[in-house]
Amino acid sequence: MDKKGEIDYLSKIVKQDVSVITNINYAHAKNFKNLRQIALAKSEIINNTRVNGSIVLNADDDFFALHKNIAIKRKLKILSFGIVNQNANIKLISIKQISNKFKATIIINNFKTYFFISNNFQNNILNILATLTVLSIFLDISKLNKNIFMGFKTPNGRGDISKIKFNNKNLYLIDESYNSNPLSLKSAILNFDKIKIKKGKKYLLLGDMLELGKHSKRLHQSIGKIINNTKIDKIFVKGSEVLFTYNSISKKKKGRVLNNNSQIIDLIKNDLNNNDYLMVKASNATGINKIINSFKGSK
């Protein structure tokens, strides 16, 4: 969705029984003045949910109350999920690492249970909570296999990790190059910072976040503060808008500005050493994903 009316048009065709709004952020924001306008555009899905249908909302989102009030007027069944808001129907209570997986303890409509998940990344946890909330409409969640989420494979370009062999070096490539917006980039950076490595360094290659319109400069600059508070070693950028990010990070974290795709190859070839990690994040239209996909064949 990048403009008012798109969700209204599509949801009138579908006439869904269950709708989900995961979050409100500055993705595809070029045609909106502010986040509230985006929230109202997304609320179009509530207006077209069938009578006596259900709406699933993120209780941690800043526009939860707005969407809830619209759903009340539509007389829909409202279900919520969250990590911070403990009034949510389905909420995370705790998460604890056990060997190579994490035990997520969850309250589901006042019933306490748990599931094993592969990582403790917040965006992953929120997606799981949203999924469980939808499932709870149709079945008894307490009877689900505790390892049901362990088989989930991260889609290509959405944070999948590849071990590649290049120039006699073992490198770890975290591919986030399918898309980029302020919220997903923040999540990816914080997830990258959480990864514990015994050897090697962490490098970050960023491309432009596109379709942000007049919000672009401010939102790119805001990423600098997030990066400065991480243990990521060096930042490299390619693009015009992402220069606002590069100019906002501390001097010690600055790698360099890349001007073409061949310099991306040179970065991987010359700057990375054995056991180093490189995370790549950019909007799909930048074309950086094509370069990264070529390296993922070097396993």
Model regions and ranges:
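Conserved nucleotide-sensing/catalytic segment adjacent to the nucleotide-binding pocket
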Residues: 1, 7-11
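A glycine-rich beta-strand to alpha-helix segment
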Residues: 268, 272-296
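Acidic, Mg2+-coordinating active-site environments of NTP-dependent enzymes
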Residues: 11, 17-172, 194, 198-201, ...
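Glycine/threonine-rich flexible loop motifs
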Residues: 29-36, 185, 213-217, 289-291
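Glycine-rich phosphate/pyrophosphate-binding beta-alpha loops
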Residues: 154-157, 177-187
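Switch II (G3) loop of P-loop NTPases
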Residues: 1-3, 173-179
